[in-house]
Amino acid sequence: MKKIKIKDKNMTKFIIVRHGQSKSNEGGYLAGVTDVPLSSLGEKQANAVCQYIINKYKIDAIYSSPLERACNTVKGVADALDLPIIKEDNLIELDFGELEGLTLEQIKNNFDNDYGKWANDPGVYVPKGGEAMSHLQARVVEKLKEIAKKEGEKTVLVGSHSSVIRALQCYIQGLPLEKMKNTPWVVNASLAEINFDGENFYIFKYGYDGHLVNLF
């Protein structure tokens, strides 16, 4: 992973959080762009990650996917610091098209060929009526650069989703999306610390979940 010492360059620091467990995660079905709330465990995870962030970082601004599960995961920080949550459509999860709302078992039984393609190559396969991962990656990178230009040398909290974080990791590491299936999974309410110096992104933390240890 690309790394650089913060003191070497002026940077925007992004703390990017995957939402806490949602009702769809709990129920084992794909939500994608469908708006679903956090589960009771997800609410506890959100509280834990917010407390960690408040204690660890000086957050200057908060952005989020417009979906409830992402916004409510970072709401604790917004409330504690009296900061608005700026909702950005380009930080939203991947649109799974006709697979939205289906369990993995339903996908396997009804879209067997699609299930195999998706399971084996999530970075490349595009579900019917859905979004390509390459499009998601491009919109996320563009939006983060736009935020960095606006916020400057600040620490920015971002509430988002697993596909967003994994696609961003591929971009930063220069990996083709064909390799996305080999990137580490990011659990609910874990976070990534990623800096941007105006030209390049650098990963300092990825999938950090130490704040969740007492919840299990």
Language-model segments: residues:
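Acidic, low-complexity terminal tails and accessory targeting/binding regions
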Residues: 2-12, 94-109, 149-154, 170-216
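Short, hydrophobic/glycine-enriched beta-strand segments
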Residues: 13-19, 158
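Active-site-proximal alpha-helix that buttresses catalytic centers in soluble enzyme cores
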Residues: 21-87
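Short active-site segment of divalent metal-dependent hydrolases/proteases
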Residues: 22, 164-165
